[in-house]
Amino acid sequence: MADEIGFFQLNTGAKIPSVGLGTWQAAPGVVGDAVAAAVKIGYQHIDCASRYGNEIEIGKVLKKLFDDGVVKREKLFITSKIWLTDLDPPDVQDALNRTLQDLQLDYVDLYLMHWPVRLKKGTVDFKPENIMPIDIPSTWKAMEALVDSGKARAIGVSNFSTKKLSDLVEAARVPPAVNQVECHPSWQQHKLHEFCKSKGIHLSGYSPLGSPGTTWVKADVLKSPVIEMIAKEIGKSPAQTALRWGLQMGHSILPKSTNEGRIRENFDVLGWSIPKEMFDKFSKIEQARLVQGTSFVHETLSPYKTLEELWDGEI
């Protein structure tokens, strides 16, 4: 299966695997086994983040996989993200150094700004009084230095609207390679897709299954009658159908699971396709953003007074 895996080319010339393992909400104690299983199944992209609180465990597993000869470092694409408490420019390099130490790596393939939001250094919660003013171009300049140092092969952003991404492109010396955002059949992001395509920025989709298993977001994407009907027609599961939709839309996908059977099922999305007449039916699915970022909005204490401002109307 590993030989079949597809890639998308980044504006750096590097290739990002089309299917990656998401590790958000993968609990310590189980995330390591999930990463090991995924790599052995054939996954070549592991999506991490400082905020997920599990990079130390992932690092131990990666080292063992390398030491045991299961996979070579250069065959894996490792993404991580800088958390919002480290976005003051002088803190950016230290944040990546901590992630590299935790992951036991010399470099990451991709380093993302997790949100266009800054929180007070040292805080752990999302209280409004912890939200700080953010200077995205200055933080980005510090991110660019990570590329210069070789510790990040590519840099990008996450949860950026079309407008915020456009503003960053205007200011950047090193253009963002990726915008990682929520993307699934119930939140298709057509406007952002078109903008990213026009600027050579790769869109990567987190929660491509709508975050099943979470309690704090409405996550019934896979119960869409459209998806259920198409899945039945083509003889695939609803999850595989939703994931394949993402690939055919032209973006990489980051399904998260700690169940080996589902990790395997989620990887079996290559070598077949959804016929055009069925693919067109996805346009009938009702749209709703699941991950809204309400914690980052406050009428007096945040730069973003409303969700409309946070997402620049893409809500």
UniProtKB/Swiss-Prot annotation:
Keywords: Acetylation, NADP, Oxidoreductase, Phosphoprotein
CDD domains noted in UniProt: AKR_AKR4C1-15
SUPFAM superfamilies in alphabetical order: NAD(P)-linked oxidoreductase
Source superkingdom: Eukaryota
GO cellular component terms attached to this protein's record: cytosol
GO molecular function: oxidoreductase activity
Enzyme Commission number(s) from the entry: 1.1.1.-
Catalytic residues of the enzyme: Y52
Keyword Coiled coil among record annotations: no
EC class of the enzyme, as a word: oxidoreductase
Modified residues (Phosphoserine): S295
InterPro entries: AKR, AKR4C, Aldo/ket_reductase_CS, NADP_OxRdtase_dom, NADP_OxRdtase_dom_sf
Sites where the protein binds NADP(+): 23-24, 47, 114, 158-159, 180, 207-213, 256-258, 262-266
Record PTM N-acetylalanine, positions in chain: A2
One Pfam assignment: Aldo_ket_red
PANTHER family assigned: ALDO/KETO REDUCTASE
Role of this protein: Oxidoreductase that may act on a broad range of substrates such as ketosteroids, aldehydes, ketones and sugars.
Family named by the database record: Belongs to the aldo/keto reductase family.
Protein name: Aldo-keto reductase family 4 member C11
Taxonomic path: Eukaryota, Viridiplantae, Streptophyta, Embryophyta, Tracheophyta
Name of encoding gene: AKR4C11
